[in-house]
Swiss-Prot record:
Modified residues (Pyrrolidone carboxylic acid): 23
GO molecular function terms attached to this record: ion channel inhibitor activity; potassium channel regulator activity; toxin activity
Provenance organism: Androctonus amoreuxi
Pfam family, one: Toxin_2
SUPFAM superfamilies, alphabetized: Scorpion toxin-like
Record comment regarding domains: Has the structural arrangement of an alpha-helix connected to a beta-sheet by disulfide bonds (CSalpha/beta).
Family: Belongs to the short scorpion toxin superfamily. Potassium channel inhibitor family. Alpha-KTx 15 subfamily.
Disulfide bridge positions per record: 30-50, 35-55, 39-57
Name of this chain's protein: Potassium channel toxin alpha-KTx 15.7
Swiss-Prot/TrEMBL keywords: Disulfide bond, Ion channel impairing toxin, Neurotoxin, Potassium channel impairing toxin, Pyrrolidone carboxylic acid, Secreted, Signal, Toxin
Signal sequence annotation: 1-22
Tissue expression from the record: Expressed by the venom gland.
Gene Ontology cellular component annotations, sorted alphabetically: extracellular region
Keyword Secreted: yes
């Protein structure tokens, strides 16, 4: 039981570190859906959204 808890905790911590770096924040100002072109130029993928007036891209 103790060993399985350690393995589960280790997997949880590793997955948090992997998925926590899944965003790229830019300093480009945006409104609405204008982040697609910004993200395509920054990271090569047109997947992003405008959060608090700044583009956040998702690779």
């Amino acid at each position: 039981m103790k060993f399985s808890s350690i393995i589960l905790l280790t997997l949880l911590i590793c997955s948090m570190s992997i998925f926590g770096n899944g965003q790229v924040q830019t300093n480009k100002k945006c409104k609405g859906g204008s982040c697609a072109s910004v993200c395509a130029k920054e990271i090569g993928v047109a997947a992003g959204k405008c959060i608090n007036g700044r583009c956040v891209c998702y690779p």
